[in-house]
UniProtKB/Swiss-Prot annotation:
InterPro entries: KH_dom-like_a/b, KH_dom_type_2, KH_sf_prok-type, Ribosomal_S3_C_sf, Ribosomal_uS3_bac-typ, Ribosomal_uS3_C, Ribosomal_uS3_CS. The keyword NADP does not apply. Its main location: plastid. This is Small ribosomal subunit protein uS3c. The gene is rps3. It comes from Cucumis sativus (Cucumber). The keyword Transcription does not apply.
């Protein structure tokens, strides 16, 4: 059987960049990783509670963290930042206070910025959230996958593969269903492929959604 490598790690330094940009002493490296995870979890929880914007999709494509001696810079790439923009900087300040409460930043200043991304449905995380919302509302998985493919085609991608695994439609035996449209060259390193793995809780149990999007070839 073929061994599946993570498409993002496979392309690091070629077509993909790191989402955390900092250096640390080897002994303190694990602390830095845990700190990053706390920041990401805190932001996602806050967005889930306060910023339900568009059909149950939070719209976070990725969160980049850059650290210096005196500053932690967090950039949130969002597809639908309407609520944040409408409320001005008040929501961002509230989010900064929430994140600072969660972890000890010490003498470092925390700065959070929000960047809007074009073609949000060209990003696998946002697309996975859309499919998860559909599955929670008991929409047929085939219908949800086809709708997701339509949305990515409008975003101008070259290919997409969607896979859903688990107790699909409440069937007793778990299975894997997938659909592909266009080209998805997973073995070509110069092909820019975005990927995400997203768990969704349904009344029948947890389903796993995996999405590969072929953006462009460099």
């Amino acid at each position: 059987m073929g061994q599946k490598i993570n498409p993002l790690g496979f392309r690091l330094g070629a077509t993909q960049g790191h989402h955390s940009l900092w250096f640390a002493h080897p002994k303190k490296y694990s602390e830095g990783l845990q700190e990053d995870q706390k920041i990401r979890d805190c932001i996602q929880n806050y967005v889930q509670k306060n910023m339900r914007i568009f059909s149950g999709v939070e719209g976070i494509a990725r969160i980049e963290i850059q650290k210096r001696i005196d500053l932690i810079q967090v950039i949130i790439f969002m597809g639908f930042p309407k609520l944040v923009i409408d409320d001005g900087s008040r929501k961002i300040e509230e989010l900064q206070i929430n994140v600072q409460k969660e972890f000890n930043s010490g003498n470092r200043k925390l700065n959070i910025a929000i960047t809007r991304i074009g073609n949000p449905y060209g990003h696998p995380n946002i697309l996975a959230e859309f499919i998860a919302g559909q599955l929670k509302n008991r929409v047929s998985f085939r219908k949800a996958m086809k709708k997701a493919i339509e949305l990515t085609e409008q975003a101008g991608t070259k290919g997409i593969q969607v896979q859903i695994a688990g107790r699909i439609d409440g069937k007793e035996i778990a299975r894997v269903e997938w659909i592909r449209e266009g080209r998805v060259p997973l073995q070509t390193i110069r092909a820019k492929i975005d990927y995400c793995c997203y768990p969704v809780r349904t009344i029948y149990g947890i389903l796993g959604i995996k999405i590969w999007i072929f953006v462009d070839e460099q």
